[in-house]
Amino acid sequence: MIDVTRHTVLIGAAAGFGEIDATGPAQAAPPLGGMEPLNSTDGVFTPSKGWGIQKFSFSNPEPSIQFAGLLFAFEVISFENNFGIDPLAVTIERRIDRVRMAGTRLRWAGGQESKAGLVSAELRLTAAGAIEWAVEAAIDAPIKAIKTIVRGLPRGRISLAAEAWCDFGDDEQVFEYPALGGGMATPLAVVEGHDKRFWGISALQTEVRPARFAFLAGPDGYKTELVYEPGAWERPQAATTCKWRIVAAPDFASVAKTHFDWVAKSWQLPDFQQRSDAPDWMKKLALVLSLHGQHWTGYVHNDFDQQLEILRWTAKQIDPRNVMVFLNGWDGRYYWDYPRFEVGARTGGEVAFARLVRKAKTLGYRIAVMFGSNVARRNDPDFPKIADARLRDGNGDFFPANYVDWDGDRKGDGFMVFMNLAVASWRNHLRERIASIVSRFAIDAYFLDICGLWENNCDGDMLVGTRQLVDELAQRFPGVAPIAEMQYDAQMGFIPMSHVPRYSLYPQANFGVVASFNHLSFPAPGGGSTGIHEYGFGRYHPVILDQPQIPTITFVDDTFTTQREAVMSDIATAKQRFAARGGRT
């Protein structure tokens, strides 16, 4: 009898894809205190028909309430166990446009055991037709995460963070905002249903916290798990999630606009042309020259004198006042010599570096210099002074950084470790190294490598630490601008330029707020070398007239000597693009 009820409920939810209806058809009251007796294997392929994620090896109870054509269940997760709602200890209040659920006992061990605890949620239908809710939970142990389980969303291809569509078929997938590996630059997932409606799922955040989106395929739709984590450094025994939103629309742009309107308001994102933290020159860039110096192995692509020769030649092709020079590999062996951030000897030393910057600025160029925002070599002699800032995850374990094969042994190397800008020792060290280079050499901008890494951890909010670093440098060096790599939405409010544009399906959310240029690894003309970057080689793409990001030319060892015609062609196209944009970035 229960299996029939579950199947009927799931089919009914699937049939409600076309609209969000708060009332729904008249139905018999569900059993168990007004909740549907579903479990974790209901509505999903078990075992998975495609690639599967890890999950419980039994049917874990997921008692669910119906609202607006969808089914919702809730769990609270401590650092020791998973707890679901006891449906016999629940009160449910329904109104025409909302439902409130409050549970006073929790079940664990697959429903075999119970304990005291509170979980409550209010789901409401907004005037615009969206479902919004937040979940409150309280238990007698630190809360690790709070999960909402949604059934009834259609299957279809998925866009994550307004990036390219992917059809995952029967594969189960998990994505996270704003994690480093495969992370989302904004907490938005959109499903294009078979009815051609677009279903947007947003985490409406006012502080950066992990938001995970899991999609488990079934015959009639997705079971979608939405996971929120409070700050692991807080270890709260009572927590409230961010607000979640589900909205359906006839086109992707409508869903994206709704989400990014919230993002702009929440993080106070300015219009790029009006930004006070973007200097005037940054708003009038036609070109970025990415000049590669010393590789991890010690191989030098271009020393400082060669870089100056490149800049002198380029100044005859384009007005240097509209060109930013991005200096990377200037500080010794790339990554190996982090976090000293001192001028490398093999590329020419301080005298040659000072000459390069001075003469480049005399020509009219603007100079940006690369720093690692959260990477250090653990066997550096000075590492003990900053060792307390080594990044630990929410469980207290060191966050791994051994994913790059630097030395060619076909295995990731472990000499580098991730650091946490929320910790004063690292933030102060990095601030003083940036300040030293900026003040001594009159640098115009500083680039923060891997700035977009945010990990829930035991020591503090990495966004807050990053913003504090930027604010302190702005006070000391007005007009010297920060540049972010892997930028996520919240950082756009205080960092005006990024290294790779975001939101390709809704580009105005990026280019209306920040300027962007191509990545350090953007392949050079000719053989496609990525210079000091570990990728090695890629396919070179010439500059095109309608590209939204600032044209970027990578100079490696042979670019200036063998690829000058390709460079000249790219510069000519960049000038045409700049003119067509009215002299604006």
Label each region the model flagged.
Residues 1-16:
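N-terminal secretory signal peptides and thylakoid transit peptides that target proteins
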Residues 135-137, 147-150, 327-329, 369-373, ...:
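Glycine-rich, histidine-containing beta strand-loop boundary motifs that form or position
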Residues 286-431, 441:
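Aromatic-lined carbohydrate-binding/catalytic grooves of carbohydrate-active enzymes
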Residues 31-324, 335, 359, 363-367:
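Carbohydrate-recognition beta-sandwich/jelly-roll modules
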Residues 382-425, 474-585:
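Glycan-recognition surfaces
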Residues 3-4, 20-35:
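C-terminal segment of N-terminal export signals and the immediately downstream linker at the start
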